Structures are given as structure tokens and as C-alpha cells.
Amino acid sequence: MNRNEISFIYYVKIKLYLYNSFFIMSYIEMVLAIPLLGAIALLFVPSWKTQTIRNIALNSSLLTFLISLLLWIEFDSSSALFQFTDGVCSPNVYSDVTLAKAASSSSFSALNFALGVDGISLFFIILTTLLVPICILVSWNNIEVYVKEYCIAFLVLETLMLTVFSVLDLLLFYIFFESVLIPMFIIIGVWGSRERKIRAAYQFFLYTLFGSVLMLLAILLIYFQTGTLDIEMLYLSDFSETRQCILWLAFFASFAVKVPMVPVHIWLPEAHVEAPTAGSVILAGILLKLGTYGFLRFSIPLFPYACIYFTPLIYTMSVIAIVYTSCTTIRQIDLKKIIAYSSVAHMNFVTIGLFSQNTQGIEGSILLMISHGLVSPALFLCVGVLYDRHKTRLLRYYSGCGQTMPIFALLFVFFTMANISLPGTSSFPGEFLVFIGSYQNNSFVAFCAATGMVLGAAYALWLCNRLIYGVSKPDFINTWSDVNRREFFMFAPLIAGILWIGVYPEPFLDAMHCSCIYLLYAQ
């Protein structure tokens, strides 16, 4: 055989190997691999082929979303264990084996890039894969510089976020938990909308990074005591009450900044205001959930005594955040800041439910996080629709826009009503369960949190009145077009999700129920 024939044979063998390797992947491995492969493919596309770049990014993210739906279809809701895993021991079945393995581990060679999905991480994965193609669509026309780098940043960010929700090793969780900051820092700093975008990017990066230093030290302490960082093995470990409190505070320092809780929330409004619309969508829809997901995945099951001990601290900080940010929201004139401060209030309502020490509160918190991941991005998309037309986010310029943009007005009112938990929308069942769970644990806290709901309705109705029904400025808005087809396609899946959860939340609650019970009573 000549050289060309040999080269062709090797080429065919490599293609067959890659083909077979791809199709023997588990669903979760495919979900992680596709956006990363899309980002790698974009490296070889010339920068001037912007339409090709956008198509590759959109198709990669859409394919990832479709495969993530297969996770839900194949998911066994009767099991509390991690699913779609390869070679990961189940703590309920192999408890003696895993404990022996943990005791015998003596080096970081025991680190294992194991992936798995349970009823808690399932919906965060689906939510992530849903929002990324929406981000690509919203940036279709308004990102004109460094388009290739922009799409690569979002696809890499998607891979990192999905890995955070699916990795089963504590140190690897920390690595990807912090790695998410890098592409988001670039997105805010390069494609932000105003002169202060560099300051906002550094503020976002440094606030969230410094809070995680103590968490890294806590992870090392956990490893030296248990000899393992495998999440399933750690659920079987036992820490003294004093050590639980120390470790809990170290994890709290990292997760509280990500939520964010008062007083470490200052970075969020600035980051939202300066970020491009797609950056705000990801920031509100996914990145704010990383902190509460960390509480749920680690703080509650690993440190049960410390959770009970520090519950008054969580309740106090959460109630202050809800009331303070709700009052602050009423005084804002920037549309993005209004939505950003309302996000702080909603996420602190989530923390109240997480530490209610009962399944109603925890399930309600997860449902509320999913709802917030649909409603808040939708509101930021609405602001983006207005910003694309006149490059300002100040409320006073858009008074009476409902007269010239009736479809937009209908969408904005719908999403605003969902934001204040109108029955029939996605926020209502989540907030109702959180209220029931917190009332069972502390009725006074539930009452204080309910005042935040009233304040939320006040600023939401005030916003609708000013924006939709105010006195119009004909010279400013008469030439605007209403929501176009591309923009409606962005809103459609969010509308469907909000109505589905609001009318029929049972499939979501069924999938997460066993996992919530297991985490709550893991020890």
C-alpha cells in the first residue's frame, strides 16, 4: 500500500473511534461534551464568517438542550441516588465498601472525575441548556465585535456551569465553581454596555473569588479528616459539632456571596447594569443559583448540626435582605437595577426555605429557583428589547410604551405578575411551599418574609404603571417597532415553562422529592 492508502485507513479508523466513543457516552457526558466541541469548532472558523459562527453556536446549544431533555425522560424519580453514572458506588448499597475506600485513601490520586444527576441537579442542568440558546438568539444582531470570541465564551461558560451541577467530587466542584467566573468576567468586561463595565467586571470577579478562599481551606480540612472528596462518601462521614460549625462558616462565606445575601450583595446590581443582555440572563438565571445549590448539595447534608445552629443567622440575614432590597427597588430608576434588586429578594426567600429543616421548604426553594431562572431572565430580555431600540434603560424614557408596543406590554405584564407570584404562574407554588415550610419552623420569620411579598407587589405594580400605562412621549416612542419574530422565539419557551410550573408543578416535585428527603436525612 502507498502512503495515501495508509493515511486513508488511519483516517477511517480515527473517525470510527470518535464515532463509537461519542455514541457510547452517557447522556450527561454528551451534554457536557457538545458545547465544548462547539467552542473548539469555532476556533477554526474565520472571524469574518459571523453568520456561520452564530449558527454553530446556536445549533450546538440547541442540541445540548434536546439531549438534556433525555435526562429527564430517562430519569427514575423513585430513586434518591445519582443516576447516569459510570462506576460510582451508591452509599445506600455499598456503604461499607465506600467507607473503607475513604479510610484507605491517602492522596489526591483518589480524585475522580465522576458525573451524576439526581432530582436536584436535573432541573438546573435543563435550565442551563435552555437559557444558553436564548442568550445566543438575543445577541444575534446586537453583538457585532468579536462575535467568535463571544460565542466561544458562552459555550465554554455553559460547559463549566453544567459540570458544576453534575460533578461528584468536592474539589472538582470547587474548581469549576470558581472557573465559571472567568468567562463571565470576560463577557462583562469586553461586551458590557457602558464605560464602567471594567469596574463592574472586576467587582464581580473579586467579590465572588475572595469569598471562596475559606471554602478551599475547608475542603482541605475535610480531605485530611476523611481521606476522600467523593460526594457520596462524604455523605457517610461524621464531623464533630465544633468542626461542623467551622466548616459550615467557611462554606457559607463562599455561597453567601453567590446568592447574594446582604451585605455582600453590592456587586450584583452593578454587574447586571453593565453586562450585555445575554450576560444578565445567565447571571440571573444560573449563576445566582450556584450559591443556593452549594447550600443544598453540601452545607445541609454534610453539616446538619451546624445548619440547625446557624439557622437564626440565615433567617435574620434573609429577612433583612428581603425587606431592604424590596424597599430599595422602589427607589430605582434603572430598569436593570429594579430587576437585579428584586432578584436579591427572591433568592433570599429561597435561603429561608432551604434552612426550614423540612421537605416542603426545600422542595419549594428548588421550585422557586427554577421559576426565578425563567422569570428573571425573561424580564431582562424585556429590558433588552427596549434597550435595543433606544440604547437607554432609564424608566422615564419609556413611559406609555404600551400604546405603541402592545405585544411587548402584554409580555412584560405577564412576566411581572409571575415575578410577584400570581397564582397560575411558576413562582406561586414555590413561594407557597417555602411559606408553609418556614411557618412550620418559625412562624415569625414566615410573617416577616410575607411582608417582602407585599413590598414586591408594590414595586412591580408601580413599575407596570410607569412603563406601560404612563403618559407617552410621542417624539421618542412612536417610531418603535413591536416585538419581532426572533424576540418572540426567545420568550416562547420561558412563557411555556412559567405556565407549566404554575398550573401543573407535580412532575417537577415528583422528580426532586426522593433526593430532597435523602439530603435532608443523609446523616
UniProtKB/Swiss-Prot annotation:
Keywords, in A-Z order: Electron transport, Membrane, Mitochondrion, NAD, Respiratory chain, Translocase, Transmembrane, Transmembrane helix, Transport, Ubiquinone
Presence of the UniProt keyword Protease in the record: no
One GO cellular component, as annotated: mitochondrial membrane
Alphabetized InterPro entries for the sequence: NADH_Q_OxRdtase_chainM/4, NADH_UbQ_OxRdtase, ND/Mrp_TM
Compartments where located: Mitochondrion membrane
Membrane-spanning ranges: 22-42, 62-82, 120-140, 149-169, 170-190, 204-224, 246-266, 276-296, 303-323, 338-358, 366-386, 404-424, 444-464, 488-508
Record membrane topology: Multi-pass membrane protein
Keyword tRNA-binding belongs to the record: no
GO biological process: ATP synthesis coupled electron transport; electron transport coupled proton transport
Record EC number: 7.1.1.2
A GO molecular-function annotation: ubiquinone binding
Annotated catalysed reactions: a ubiquinone + NADH + 5 H(+)(in) = a ubiquinol + NAD(+) + 4 H(+)(out)
Family to which the UniProt record says this protein belongs: Belongs to the complex I subunit 4 family.
Protein role: Core subunit of the mitochondrial membrane respiratory chain NADH dehydrogenase (Complex I) that is believed to belong to the minimal assembly required for catalysis. Complex I functions in the transfer of electrons from NADH to the respiratory chain. The immediate electron acceptor for the enzyme is believed to be ubiquinone.
Name listed for the protein in its UniProt record: NADH-ubiquinone oxidoreductase chain 4
Species of origin: Prototheca wickerhamii
